[in-house]
Amino acid sequence: MNLEVTLAGKTFKNPVTTASGTFGSGAEYEQFVDLAALGAVTTKGVANVPWEGNPTPRVAETYGGMLNAVGLQNPGIDLFCKRDIPHLKEKGASIIVNVCGRSTSDYVEVVERLADEPVDLLEINVSCPNVKEGGIAFGQNPDALYEITKAIKAK
C-alpha cells in the first residue's frame, strides 16, 4: 500500500512523523523505533546557540497528566549539524527541523545555516509556552510573527 504524502513540495513515505520536543533528535528512541520507517523525524527545537533550558525540576505530575517546562534545551545549530543531521541521514530518516529563537535574527541565522544541509523541511517554533523570552511573544503578536516569516522567506 502506498502511503506517500506530499507536504510543501516534499514527498514523505508516509504521514507518520514525530512531534517536536518529544523525540529529541531521534537517537534517544532508535532502540524502540526504526527511524527509517517513519515519514519523518521532527527534531526538538534548534537555536543559533546552545540553550541550557530551564532549571530542574522540569516535569510535574498532575491529576490529569504531566506538565513540562524544559525550556527548549538544545545543543545549538553547529553541533546539531555536525552530530544529529548525519546520524539521522545514516539511519535513513527524513528530517524536519524545528527552528527556535529569541529574535528574528536568531531564526534567520538558523535557517541560513540549514540551507546547505540535507534536511527536508523546517518547522518554525513561535509558540512554545515554556520560554520566558522570545517564543511565546512571537506567536501571540501578529506583527512579530509577520516579521519572522517575512525574514525567513527572504532567505
Language model regions located:
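Flavin-dependent oxidoreductase catalytic cores
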Residues: 1-155
